[in-house]
Swiss-Prot record:
InterPro entries: IF-2B-related, IF-M1Pi, IF_2B-like_C, Initiation_fac_2B_a/b/d, M1Pi_N, NagB/RpiA_transferase-like. The keyword Isomerase applies. The active site is at 240 (proton donor). This is Methylthioribose-1-phosphate isomerase. The record marks 160 as: Transition state stabilizer. Catalyzes the interconversion of methylthioribose-1-phosphate (MTR-1-P) into methylthioribulose-1-phosphate (MTRu-1-P). Gene3D superfamilies: translation initiation factor eif-2b, domain 1, Translation initiation factor eif-2b, domain 2.
């Protein structure tokens, strides 16, 4: 059995604008929003209208292509000066997502040797489209590899949203659910709600249900009980940054699940493309963890749920040490062993 699964798309290039699925409105409304400036793109990333490491990179690439169309420059030097300014500006939007900087660096490199403004604009648009197309192919390949870790009927726990709307298509951690459905392999997702912004409750459940994949929602503090009582086969998560030794930054709460997986002796997988790896950093201690606004914790849908003036700690990510990870699933295959050596071999020139 091989069928095509219809999955939602988060980013659409229109030539002179970008259309995004506004993920802050889900699951109540599937609202598509038009972005017409680099400032719009920056704000959409900061406000989590676009989120997920690969999608952030894609949005940034299109944002730079869009900005380049609007520069009033008298020569290529002035053009590149404005372009580099916008690259630096976009880099301030989400400091933990390595795909953002990967895409920015790739767009910079694409026009490094270009000597005319017209060609620079054309190349930037082509490069952004290529980044999006490559990500779809990468997610498909990653999903094929991930599917080999599971069997028909498996119940698999996940956190946050590492799905189609966090990438060009298919997703990373959710890719095996979609590829499995295409092949007639039934996988049942258990989705942690993912406080404080509820990406699991709002986004993962929405997109899986839209695609006809079985999904059960749990609160974050139900994870241990669910693993123990619901025959959970494995845990699979995405990543925002993986460093040279395999330490992984992902949505806060991921480390909790890794510890639980070790206790209950079930596999804990990280699914991420090579663009999410940061081999310049040796361990997770070097990763900068973004801290977000306290109102994400003190309010739900604008309703205050905590005492006014209470101290808040709101890290967006945590670090899972490599020794808790059963396998890192990439488009090139599954790493299971000495992560430092295996990751280094992936990036050997």
């Amino acid at each position: 059995m091989n069928t095509t699964v219809a999955v939602p798309r988060a980013i659409i290039w229109k030539g002179d604008s970008i259309t995004i699925l506004n993920q802050t409105k889900l699951p109540h409304v599937a609202e598509y929003k038009t972005l017409t400036s680099i400032e719009d793109v920056w704000k959409s990333i900061v406000m989590l209208e676009v989120r997920g490491a690969p999608a952030i990179g894609i949005a940034a690439a299109f944002g730079l292509a869009l900005a380049a169309q609007k520069y009033e420059a008298i020569n290529i030097v002035e053009f590149k000066t404005k372009f580099n300014r916008d690259c630096n500006y976009l880099g301030t939007s989400r400091p933990t997502a390595v795909n953002l900087f990967w895409a920015i660096d790739r767009m910079r490199a694409a026009i490094e040797e270009v000597s005319t403004i017209k060609i620079a604009r054309e190349i930037l648009e082509e490069e952004a489209l290529q980044i999006q197309q490559e990500d779809e192919q990468v997610c498909r390949s990653l999903g094929e590899h991930a599917l080999t870790c599971f069997q028909d009927g498996d119940r698999i726990l996940t956190i946050c949203n590492a799905g189609s709307i966090a990438t060009a298509r298919y997703g990373t951690a959710l890719a095996p659910f979609y590829i499995g459905k295409e092949k007639g392999i039934h996988l049942h997702a258990y989705a942690c709600e993912t406080r404080p912004v509820l990406q699991g409750a709002r986004l993962t459940t929405w997109e899986l249900r839209e695609a006809g994949v079985d999904v059960t929602l749990i609160t974050d503090n139900m994870a241990a009980h669910t693993i123990r009582t619901k025959n959970i086969s494995a845990i699979i998560v995405g990543a925002d940054r993986i460093v040279a030794n395999g330490d992984t930054a992902n949505k806060v709460g991921t480390l909790n699940l890794a510890i639980l997986a070790k206790h209950y002796q079930i596999p804990f997988y990280v699914a991420a493309p090579l663009s999410t790896f940061d081999t310049k950093k040796k361990t997770g201690n070097e990763i900068i963890i973004e801290e977000r606004d306290e109102t994400e914790v003190t309010k739900i849908n604008g309703q205050q749920i905590a005492p006014a003036g209470i101290h808040i700690y709101n890290p967006a990510f945590d670090i899972t040490p490599h020794e808790f990870i059963s396998g890192i699933i990439t488009e090139k295959g599954i790493l299971q062993g000495d992560y430092t050596k295996e990751i280094a071999s992936l990036f050997e020139k």
